[in-house]
A protein has these predicted regions:
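Thiol/disulfide oxidoreductase modules built on the thioredoxin-like
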Residues: 82-87, 94-145
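Hydrophobic beta-strand core positions in alpha/beta domains
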Residues: 34-36, 67, 113
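Short pre-active-site segment immediately N-terminal to redox-active cysteine/selenocysteine motifs
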Residues: 31-33, 37-41, 107
Length: 147
C-alpha cells in the first residue's frame, strides 16, 4: 500500500455506540493501534470477526482496536455486533466511506497497524486470520510496543 510508512490520515468520526460522541484520531496518538475496516454487509468480515473476538477475549491482542464501520448504516452495524460480538475498543462510523478512501481501502475487511507516532506500518488485505496474525501482525505489534 502506498500509505505504509506515511502518517495515518486524520479523522473525526461518530462513535457507533454513542452517536452523540465524536472521536478524533488525535486521541490515539502515543498508542500502537489497529484499524479494522468492516461492514455488516461484508461476507468475509463474518469469517474474520470471530477470530478477532478470540484474540481480544484471550488477551492475546491487548492493543486498542478501532473498528471502522465502512459504508454502512447504524442499525445493521449494531445488529452485527450484537450477533457476532464486539471486539473493538471503539467503533467509528464511516457512512460515506471517506475515511476508508483516505486510508486507501479497496475492499473490506482490511486491517491497518498504526504506531505510536501515528505512522501506518502494515496493512492486512482481506480477513486477518491465524496465519496473518502469527506471521505478521503479532510480531510487529511486539516490536512497535518496544519502540
Amino acid at each position: 500500500s502506498p500509505l505504509i510508512g506515511k502518517p495515518a490520515p486524520a479523522f473525526q468520526l461518530q462513535d457507533l455506540n454513542h452517536l452523540d460522541r465524536t472521536v478524533s484520531s488525535d486521541e490515539l496518538k502515543g498508542k500502537v493501534w489497529l484499524l479494522n475496516v468492516w461492514a455488516s454487509w461484508c461476507e468475509s468480515c463474518r469469517e474474520e470477526h470471530p477470530y478477532i473476538m478470540q484474540l481480544v477475549r484471550s488477551g492475546e491482542l491487548k492493543n486498542t482496536v478501532v473498528g471502522l464501520q465502512y459504508k454502512d448504516k447504524v442499525a445493521p452495524g449494531l445488529a452485527f455486533l450484537t450477533q457476532y460480538g464486539n471486539p473493538y475498543t471503539l467503533v467509528l462510523r464511516d457512512p460515506e466511506g471517506q475515511t476508508g478512501i483516505n486510508f486507501g481501502v479497496y475492499g473490506v475487511p482490511e486491517t491497518f497497524i498504526i504506531d505510536k507516532k501515528g505512522i501506518i506500518r502494515h496493512k492486512v488485505i482481506g480477513p486477518m486470520m491465524q496465519k496473518e496474525w502469527t506471521n505478521d501482525v503479532k510480531p510487529l505489534l511486539a516490536k512497535l510496543e518496544a519502540e
